[in-house]
Amino acid sequence: MQYGFARSSEKSFKLDPSVTDPEFHGFWTWPCTMFNVPPGSNFMTVIYEFPVDAETTLQHYDIYFTNEELTQDQKDLIEWYRNVFRPEDLNLVESVQRGLKSRGYRGQGRIMTDKQRSGISEHGIAYFQHLVAQYHQ
């Protein structure tokens, strides 16, 4: 599980002001599926990532809303995921993936972890990358 704290943004995710605990949760299942649940939202995302080779990852996003008819805010959020978040996220995934083949890789790569396993730490991502590296050895 990965978690962090969400902040409202006019450009992306708008956090409901009534939410008192803005904690974001991400759950992943080996080898390539992640479920993300933003705080106080009426949607979740499911992300599938398929490493093709050392430089390429195929990525597929699904966004599930609780309502059938999308609001304008929801349509705007979908566009933000498509045009901003996904390209940034995919670039990060592929840069870590390339780092796994470098001679300087020492089990952590370009991922931030801390001993306290705090909410800003990326232990889940580091563990996932470790599993990918083991699988491809």
Task: Mark where each language-model region is.
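C-terminal catalytic domain of Rieske-type non-heme iron oxygenases
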Residues: M1-Q137
